[in-house]
From Swiss-Prot:
Membrane-spanning residues: none
Region (Disordered): 20-84, 421-549
Modification sites for Phosphothreonine: 422
UniProt keyword terms in alphabetical order: Phosphoprotein, Synapse
Protein name stated in the entry: Synapsin-2
A Gene Ontology term for the protein's cellular component: synapse
Protein source organism: Rattus norvegicus
Region feature G, mapped onto this chain: 422-458
Chain positions found as Phosphoserine: 10, 426
Amino acid sequence: MMNFLRRRLSDSSFIANLPNGYMTDLQRPEPQQPPPAPGPGTATASAATSAASPGPERRPPPAQAPAPQPAPQPAPTPSVGSSFFSSLSQAVKQTAASAGLVDAPAPSAASRKAKVLLVVDEPHTDWAKCFRGKKILGDYDIKVEQAEFSELNLVAHADGTYAVDMQVLRNGTKVVRSFRPDFVLIRQHAFGMAENEDFRHLVIGMQYAGLPSINSLESIYNFCDKPWVFAQMVAIFKTLGGEKFPLIEQTYYPNHREMLTLPTFPVVVKIGHAHSGMGKVKVENHYDFQDIASVVALTQTYATAEPFIDAKYDIRVQKIGNNYKAYMRTSISGNWKTNTGSAMLEQIAMSDRYKLWVDACSEMFGGLDICAVKAVHGKDGKDYIFEVMDCSMPLIGEHQVEDRQLITDLVISKMNQLLSRTPALSPQRPLTTQQPQSGTLKEPDSSKTPPQRPAPQGGPGQPQGMQPPGKVLPPRRLPSGPSLPPSSSSSSSSSSSSSAPQRPGGPTSTQVNASSSSNSLAEPQAPQAAPPQKPQPHPQLNKSQSLTNAFSFSESSFFRSSANEDEAKAETIRSLRKSFASLFSD
């Protein structure tokens, strides 16, 4: 880590990354520091301080020394030294955080208090009004971003990072912005052959980014082909039987070549994947069926054929969360498509039979939070299920406002579950190795350890300066500069060499002589073994100590799973102090 900071601080481009006012503080003349107010207990200390000789960079010119002020200024200007090291500390913090060497600061409370919800829907429904005033876990607001599939784009990376770009037209103004949604509500079809719109690649991108959604992205992708969904209904039909789940008969043609003849007519031919009654043709006889086969050949897609049911009315059973509704739609215009022309819609009672239909279909593709089952009630008195819709189903009837509120509550419930299951940002790794506390240390067998497997600490992927406590740290070559007093260094070496146990050497690349090893391991305990003899430490060491105290190196970013964290932490602080003292010494 220290090598990285040295290269970073010595780079010519480092000046450009310094905070504003950094160079101005260096060029500003040093203001005079007002002395503290004299008191009865400070007369002796003031005399001793004036008698002591300050450092060369702190000594003011004799001619410019003003008379002592009787009282300090209310707001004294900070000195050059404090401004210098304050700016430097901030710059090094930003540099180390960008390199991932220290824990990034937690986001502010204002930025954490909102979760972004992406709603994919047409603009005629304003979902922002539905979520206005709603909160998640009582703390987080919901920021709604609404757009159609055609107005969205995204990029997703394998490490989980992603960004969604939105280009919408609001009141004649084009709005372009990028954001990171936390949840997605999809209320629009992702694929439709009638309008030549295929947005399955966006669904794949959302799944790639791991975005949670309603319904699930897997189910939305599976609903992009109606025959695929009908195959799931066939499985339900085989499980429940025709009495409980009356599924209509259907024939699937992957292409036009097999569309030769059908045993009975009339039939309804559905070409490809379309919505709102598009691509559906009623065929009365064999000749019309051959004509439709030629049309299917031009579309180069699949087709299905099912018997035409002379319907008395249509049935739609919808489920939103735990809410159930059933509707009956009767054609007034006489068209065989009840969604064409005039029709009468009314809500009917929810029976156990209808509830069984929608509950069985809501379990397909891992579960559907929003779905609806469509069926026809023939004039023969029988029901025929022919389609299942997912979360893109249109809301109908007189209770559309209530249905939108049900969807809103369902989204909030899912977001609450997701937020409560979110793990900690930096969980502690399990303890995989333990450092022996006493006794003879066993020599590690390098032949049993795979060379490519990184160790829990101090592996090849970690920055320099984070070696495990079990390895002997090599001495660092520092340029000539201020250092600790010789008496303190010698006393620290002698005391620690007699008390600290002898540690085995690591690999060949980390072995050093015994004296260097003892000095390297003993210097972290130097302030406890023998305090310095000088009454005032070197000013440069004070600066480096202030720099060291300015950093917040947490245990989660360094020395994970270490049984001797204090010693390793002291070694790192010592290295930081020495390196900064040598870098910024006069």
